[in-house]
Amino acid sequence: MSTSRLYTLVLVLQPQRVLLGMKKRGFGAGRWNGFGGKVQEGETIEDGAKRELLEESGLRVDTLHKVGHISFEFVGSPELMDVHIFSTDHVHGTPTESEEMRPQWFQLDQIPFADMWPDDSYWFPLLLQKKKFCGHFKFHGQDTILSYSLREVDEF
């Protein structure tokens, strides 16, 4: 029986561009990703998302929109990653490099999928179309998707 742990992921989407961060250390290092991490005990999922965005990019946000919910399974790991994905189009502050992430804006037609998690190319198009989605990805290592399911949903 697997256990799961709550994680958040925040994508700052503005007209024609998205803010991603180059992960500098730890799990997923060397890949572009949104901003997020583990939800702490006593913290709501949305509060955890706001905290992680601030810690990793220096940006504050008033409103987040839940757009996705994906569980990730890694062969050999007993823990599922239960990831709640949010988007926002309005932030306060200027993106600032942290110990963990180096933020950079990308034009929507220049998203660096080759340097991102392999699953991103499956669900990112739904995000960009402002659709909500749920899914599950099973990985072998960090590069190979063994199986997946992904579907659009109306609400959470």
Swiss-Prot record:
Tissue and organ expression note: Expressed in liver in hepatocytes and weakly in Kupffer's cells. Expression detected in testes in primary and secondary spermatocytes and interstitial cells. High expression levels detected in the inner cortex of kidney, with lower levels detected in the tubules of the outer cortex, medulla, renal pelvis and glomeruli (at protein level). Expressed in heart, brain, spleen, lung, liver, skeletal muscle, kidney and testis.
UniProt: 8-oxo-dGTP binding residues: 23
EC number: 3.6.1.56, 3.6.1.-
Cofactor note: Binds 2 Mg(2+) ion per subunit.
Assembly and binders: Monomer.
Protein task: Oxidized purine nucleoside triphosphate hydrolase which is a prominent sanitizer of the oxidized nucleotide pool. Catalyzes the hydrolysis of 2-oxo-dATP (2-hydroxy-dATP) into 2-oxo-dAMP. Also has a significant hydrolase activity toward 2-oxo-ATP, 8-oxo-dGTP and 8-oxo-dATP. Through the hydrolysis of oxidized purine nucleoside triphosphates, prevents their incorporation into DNA and the subsequent transversions A:T to C:G and G:C to T:A. Also catalyzes the hydrolysis of methylated purine nucleoside triphosphate preventing their integration into DNA.
Protein name: Oxidized purine nucleoside triphosphate hydrolase
Organism: Rattus norvegicus (Rat)
